[in-house]
Amino acid sequence: MGDSESVNQDHGRNTFLSRVFGLQPDDITTSIRTGDMSRYPLNAYSGGSEMFSGSPTSSRIDDDDDDDEGRVPESDQQSSSGDNSDDIKANDDVIEDVELTDGNGDNYTNSKMINTNYSIFGSLRKVGQQSSDEEDDGSLSNEEEDIDEEDEIDEIDADEPLFVNSTSQRKQKRKSSVNFKNGSEMSSLLFQRILNKKDSKSNGEASNKMFTSSNQGNHNYKYRNGHDLEGGVHFNKKEGRRNSLFGSHEAGGHKSHNSAPSKGPNLLKNISILNNTPSNKVYTLSPKERALWKWANVENLDVFLQEVYKYYLGSGFSCIVLRKLLNLTTLIFVVYISTYLGYCIDYSKLPTSSRLSDIIIDQCYTTRITGITKGLLWVFYVFVGLKVVQFYFDLQNLTDMHNFYNYLLGISDNELQTIPWQNIIQQLMYLKDQNALTANVVEVKAKNKIDPLVVANRIMRKDNYLIALYNENILDLSLPIPFYKESILTKTLEWNINLCIIGFAFNESGFIKQSFLKKSQHQFITEELRKRFMLAGFLNIILSPFLVTYFVLLYFLRYFNEFKTSPGTIGARQYTPMAEWTFREFNELYHIFQKRLGLSTVIADKYINQFPKESTDLILKFISFISGSFVAVLMSLTLLDSENFLNFEVTKDRSVLFYITVFGAIWSVCRNSISDEYKVYDPDETIKELSEFTHYLPKEWEGKHHTEDVKQEFCKLYNIRLIILLRELASLVLTPFILWFSLPACSDRIVDFFSDSSTYIDGLGYVCKYATFGINQANAQKVKGGKRHQDMKMNTNNFSNEVINESDEDVLDSDSDSEIDSNDKMMRSYMYFMEDYENSENAIGKNQLPRKKYKDPSLTNPSLNTDYSWRKQFQPGQRPELFRIGKHALQVPTNVRNLGKKSTLNSENPYDNSSNLGESFINPTIMPDRDLGRNGVNGGKKEAGMLRMVKDYYKTSDIGR
């Protein structure tokens, strides 16, 4: 037939398969041949829709295509309360503006306007939940007529091919078919018929060939359209280079020192064996086929991506297995050594014995250990047995993840220890482009939305809520003591909060429960949360004696040798758990955050040590003199009679050797704690430098960086390690009181927080609204009092429009400073997120540091920078084009009380260091966007002056407000 007819058929085939199987239009052309799909009937579709007719010219999609893109129901499938009468109403008539994309941000082009009444491309609903059309439009009309018409069509089109070969054939089929009211009603029946026929034997051969791609076809297609189907990368014929997530790499040119090889996932060239493989026969496949089967049958993308990230953090199969074994061995050793020293040693014989065998009690575990202690040991044995069983199942999951990395992503365990996480994201995007086949059709849409932002939101779905929860000061973590309201967060209390709040708010699939979002369920959920706090406090009281004993022994065995060999480390500092939640940005993965925080400790010590402590130094010098004098006298006498004097008892049962050890340790601690006599004193510049790592510089500290008050506030966040350990031990006893008295009073605010901070993203589900950065939120529906309502329409070409439009309504209606701080933190998190993923200099391994920059290219062997001058990598890039912050950010709401106390937009920062603005401190090269929902550089307009003011505001004066 003519060229127009063939183009129409190819276009219709590509559009259909791209939406059903998640494949991209470019991937389908050479992967599926017309003969492979000849068994699927499409008489009704060819006769009633205009998608496969007309000239192949570019056209737009009407704004009325709201029903074409169904909402993926990635949320709770059931309510914890059992009250179904107050479910979110399905007739809210929410209008969603949907723009079909091919996964890389390019719009699909159709020959004519797409019929908008009903489409086969809506997402299938999950079991137990309404479909998108039922939620948005109430219910499908004329269901009985549709069923009758569907049965009638199945009889007529039983043997009709999916894609007819000529116009005459289409006309002939159209004449013999039943006339329907419109083409959209006919198209709505196609997908169900295909699903009903996919297991039939007559279609078995076609199914096996459905995803088979020939080498020759891929070769021709690569040079015709510039995309390598099997290689997973884009190939530019004219420039001879391959495009990656961070830009273009010249073929044969100089390769970046920190970029891993950009190679596509290694997929099977023929996966027909996987089409009919049931789940109970998966392990009969080869490791490569099994890895592909697991990827194709991902049921929960959140859990899968979290496992992918945990595997990356663990540095591969061998390291994770070794770590699990050593942790279990450590637990067994601590329990064994404590029971052995407590029941198997006769300490009364120790002074008169010279051998170990003289003081050991034989068969102590059977004769000395009885009663409660023996019962607890048996409980421990059962616990160890359960850990071994769990380790066995973890080993199977690790094997599957190892195969996924090795065969599909093409990354070995050795490479995993040095490869950047950005490269893992890149490989996942390539894998999604090559094969998005899935057994769970709802996940097709989710897999089509794999990009750095979506992956971070799925991995940190719960952590983002916790970041907002701690930063908005909703939790009362103080002891129920009058006139003592200091919040103390320890790891034990943090674990209980996760168990009581996060474990209750999210279901087993990792999605937030709908009952938390309904106003009608508010009172019930609040009472249930109070009961959980009370129950957790009761369990902590029961377990506290055993936990205290275990952790005392663990900390003693872990830190005693360190303190003995290096007594100066007793005064070492580390960040508290509250500081970690305060400093962490939204969507900031754990390894990026830990690296940033670890690199800040040197500057934090520098800031604290700048403050003079004359009185403390005088006392330390005196103590070191006294202790040093005793050590000198005892050592001198030891030299006179070294054989006898060391065992000489100075006091009862305390020899000379004992006192030499004690006084020596005291002298060492005091000498190491004395501050240097001369040092540079510039706390303002130091804390500004520190804030580039911590992203925390409250407005209240401005102009007071040199004062003792600011230093003490910072020391609460960066405390002495020994004090933190003592607090951890004390919290094992004090945590039950916080769970009983303080946290239950916050239950109402906690439930309100989840309702107000949740927003729905199509294909992603409910996430924390601050973690979305306001990008591509046109389809998002906020949850307010248990009802969905449409967000105001936002301009996706300008980030500031999206952020301000999304949040200014809340800010205008809110008088709380925490709401303003959260929105500022959201914008700041976006800036650092873009810097982490778009700056190629940050594409380094989780344990690596960036190299120093040299302007002279002749320096081929530069030394690594160890003076922390590369700290600017954690500061957002200075190129105005990278951040779409326009003049809207400077519009200060007039009806918000006390806003002037928080804003410094119209005031000059005395510590502004903007003389070198205009170029990024790390890499001035602007990398192309990929799947981040961002367009070009504002149409080429220069807005550097306004953008510079806003960036200075968020980087200097108000960092971490």
From Swiss-Prot:
One of its GO terms (biological process) is mitophagy. Residues 346-374, 639-654 are lumenal. Residues 537-557, 722-742 dip into the membrane without crossing it. Residues 132-160 have a biased composition (Acidic residues). Residues 1-91, 126-180, 198-225, 244-265, 900-940 are annotated as: Disordered. The keyword Phosphoprotein does not apply. It is found in: Preautophagosomal structure membrane; Cytoplasmic vesicle membrane; Golgi apparatus membrane; Endoplasmic reticulum membrane. InterPro entries: Autophagy-rel_prot_9. Keywords: Autophagy, Cytoplasmic vesicle, Endoplasmic reticulum, Golgi apparatus, Lipid transport, Membrane, Transmembrane, Transmembrane helix, Transport. Phosphorylated by ATG1. ATG1 phosphorylation is required for preautophagosome elongation. It is a multi-pass membrane protein. The keyword tRNA-binding does not apply. The chain crosses the membrane at residues 325-345, 375-395, 618-638, 655-675. GO terms for cellular component: autophagosome; cytoplasmic vesicle membrane; endoplasmic reticulum membrane; Golgi membrane; mitochondrion; phagophore; phagophore assembly site membrane. It comes from the Eukaryota. One of its GO terms (molecular function) is phospholipid scramblase activity. Forms a homotrimer with a solvated central pore, which is connected laterally to the cytosol through the cavity within each protomer. Acts as a lipid scramblase that uses its central pore to function: the central pore opens laterally to accommodate lipid headgroups, thereby enabling lipid flipping and redistribution of lipids added to the outer leaflet of ATG9-containing vesicles, thereby enabling growth into autophagosomes. This is Autophagy-related protein 9. It comes from Vanderwaltozyma polyspora (strain ATCC 22028 / DSM 70294 / BCRC 21397 / CBS 2163 / NBRC 10782 / NRRL Y-8283 / UCD 57-17). The gene is ATG9.
